[in-house]
Regions:
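Short, charge/polar-rich alpha-helical segments
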Residues: 1-28
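Short acidic DE-rich linear segments
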Residues: 2-3, 77-82
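Alpha-helical coiled-coil oligomerization motifs
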Residues: 24-27, 31, 35-38, 79
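Short, charge-rich amphipathic interface segments used for partner binding and complex assembly
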Residues: 34-76
Length: 82
């Protein structure tokens, strides 16, 4: 099982990195000088908050990050000595 968990974590990291790139690309179509930090705080940019595509892609990223947190918590619960 640890091998499966490790490969799952690698795939999830790849998905997160891909989605972060995608969210930044969409953000830069709306706010050309947007930075990775800016997309973590979109409320500072009304045009981002109002854009449905940005919110959709950001929601996917949020889901991946939530899954990553859940997997890490489960790993710690299953293996408290790690």
């Amino acid at each position: 099982m640890p091998e499966n968990r490790h490969s799952t974590e690698i795939i999830l990291l790849e998905l997160i990195e891909h989605q972060q790139t995608k969210v930044l690309k969409v953000a830069r179509e709306i706010v050309p000088n947007a930075t990775p930090e800016d997309i973590r705080n979109p409320q500072d940019f009304p045009d981002l908050v109002a854009d449905t595509l940005f919110n959709y892609e950001d929601g996917i990223l949020t889901g991946y990050l939530t899954l990553q947190t859940a997997i890490r918590k489960q790993t710690r619960t299953d293996n408290p000595d790690l």
